[in-house]
Amino acid sequence: MIIDQVAFRIGPLQIRWYSLSYIFGMIFAYWYIKKIDKYQVFNKESYESVISWWVISVILGGRIGYILFYNLDFYIHFPIEMLKLWNGGMSFHGALVGVMIGMYIFCRKNKIDVLAAFDLGACAVPVGIFFGRIANFINGELYGKVTDIKIGMIFPASGDLLYRHPSQLYEAFGEGFLLFIITNSLFFFTKIKTSKGMLSSVFCIWYGVIRFFIEFVREPDVQIGYIIFDQITMGQLLSIFMIIMGFYFIKLAKVQDKFSI
């Protein structure tokens, strides 16, 4: 399948679907967190400045993560390419680490509860993930392995005419849609939000597990392939660390609950 990677053009300026996915994701996160928070975690003044922290943290984290995790040798030889964001190359795990560091600094600076802020993010971020994976699908990148199932698709970027798993759609559904339903159902219909850090743990563990298993039907990145036992990809390794981080959030939540009794 072939879909134009450019959503629309304004004169010589090309607006790509992947760029729009980041824009839509951040706008939604800002609007949605403000809607469900109702100034309980973030105050009015902090909302006016937090968006710039999100944008910078996501872009820097995503780019640095991609460089370090997926294509370090290339960027060592061609360092100027690091600045060419329009050529692609972003890592979700890197963006997550980036935004967590950025939000930690922002929250400490503004005397905001860090875990409570992370929990709000756990409710909104899945929508950004959904948009990002749909953009990957439109771009025909991050496609799956060859398959004979009926929903298999041809991705010209693979260099062949074989039917492959639409792994981008699997991820959009599992990491995006389902994760949004889960975190928000817990937020609105249970008391889990009173245990600060638990929603963050659900986010990390669910995403890590879903990503780990979907990677088995996703074609590994050509520049690094498999990194452990000719079976485990970089995405899976990073997802394992994400799961571990999720259990660490559970520990933090329990510690905070103990001292708040």
Swiss-Prot record:
Binding residue positions for a 1,2-diacyl-sn-glycero-3-phospho-(1'-sn-glycerol): R133
Keyword Transmembrane helix: yes
Pfam families: LGT
Transmembrane domains' residue ranges: 13-33, 50-70, 86-106, 112-132, 169-189, 197-217, 232-252
Enzyme class: transferase
Subcellular location: Cell inner membrane
A GO cellular component annotation in the UniProt record: plasma membrane
InterPro entries the record matches: Lgt
Top-level taxon of the source organism: Bacteria
Keyword DNA-binding: no
Gene Ontology process terms (BP): lipoprotein biosynthetic process
EC number: 2.5.1.145
The protein's annotated pathway: Protein modification; lipoprotein biosynthesis (diacylglyceryl transfer)
Keywords attached to this entry: Cell inner membrane, Cell membrane, Membrane, Transferase, Transmembrane, Transmembrane helix
GO MF assignments: phosphatidylglycerol-prolipoprotein diacylglyceryl transferase activity
Membrane disposition: Multi-pass membrane protein
Database matches in PROSITE patterns: LGT (PS01311)
PANTHER family linked to this entry: PHOSPHATIDYLGLYCEROL--PROLIPOPROTEIN DIACYLGLYCERYL TRANSFERASE, PROLIPOPROTEIN DIACYLGLYCERYL TRANSFERASE
Family indicated by similarity: Belongs to the Lgt family.
Function: Catalyzes the transfer of the diacylglyceryl group from phosphatidylglycerol to the sulfhydryl group of the N-terminal cysteine of a prolipoprotein, the first step in the formation of mature lipoproteins.
Protein name as catalogued: Phosphatidylglycerol--prolipoprotein diacylglyceryl transferase
Species of the source: Ehrlichia canis (strain Jake)
